[in-house]
Amino acid sequence: MSDRPSPLADPHIAFDVSEGRRDIVVLGSTGSIGTQAIDLVLRNPDRFRVTALAASGGRVALLAEQAHRLKVAAVAVAREDVVEELRTALKALYGSEPLPELLVGPDAATRLAASPCHTVLNGITGSIGLAPTLAALEAGRTLALANKESLIVGGPLVKALAKPGQIIPVDSEHAALFQALAAGTRADVRKLVVTASGGPFRGRTRAQLADVTREDALAHPTWAMGPVITVNSATLVNKGLEVIEAHLLYDIPFDRIEVVVHPQSYVHSMVEFTDGSTLAQATPPDMGGPIAIGIGWPERVPDAAPAFDWSKASTWEFFPLDTEAFPSVGLARHVGELGGTAPAVFNAANEECVEAFLAGRLPFNGIMDTVTAVVAEHGVPVSGTSLTVPDVLEAETWARARARELAAKATAEARA
């Protein structure tokens, strides 16, 4: 075994293996990850119990329905303008029964993340998930992490708080790496191979991407996800974030993390070992498996995801990444190597540019052009060793403002 400190995500270390049912707090309960996690819990009531829910407030009726069905103790909602609507919806469902505790405001999910439970599933989208991630770690909860942005923007902060084995990755690629890494030690690992579907625009040149529309970008060939993540998959920013995440989670240098395009999305990632063997984790595209690993590890949840029908012929293809058409992975490696506030700037600028693209204010190629310009202007980041939460927030605020300025300028020039 290596004498290096254990990585953030280590399949060899069981952080908290409790007997009986596990109490779960679900953050982002009305989103894609949250709804699928709740479905898994409802199918396995002997294994899991959801004790609290948090959501932004965009789907009030669903949040109230989830709370009632799961009989949770507390509900958190970020938007204060929907509190009365939520309270009314809860009263209609609960009748004369006592309502769950209601937490309101931007920090409501963070407060909930520190509440008593076994596991916090952070399914929030975006860097707003950082504070809940830190709160869950500080409170000693097992963290099933689907919110990759919190690790990206606050890597050194997360590493300072997390205990060995405390983080279990939920996204499909890192759940795959996590399982494959269980077959050996870090000293046995030659490289990590992260697979990418290639998105809806695989095979197109940069010039052919110039006229991509919102509808085109949201038509992902293999995964059903929210709009921001779907656009990130189309630009391959999502894959760039996953490269940074793999480095942080598994303590593997960037030059030993490779991205390959696998259109079928059957193989979710691979680990190549020093003896020349490669271990791949494969299932049909479905988030049930990664979610089950996140909240159930080291146990496996039966029938969490569909299995392959090996009696049917299938084709599995692998292609090199087109770095000219999709420069996002290379830029992500660059900011990951810079460290400090650079990943936060990259992520925040991208979030603003994706929002502008979805609103029709920025062309598809303009997303990465603008993000690249913002990263270049940021210059030397605050060092990772001295990084603080205010540093991250300040860098994000600057990056968002600068991205909006550059996006508006690019749009004005295009219309002139």
State each model region's role.
Residues M1-A416:
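Catalytic, metal-anchored helix/loop core of enzyme active sites in primary metabolism
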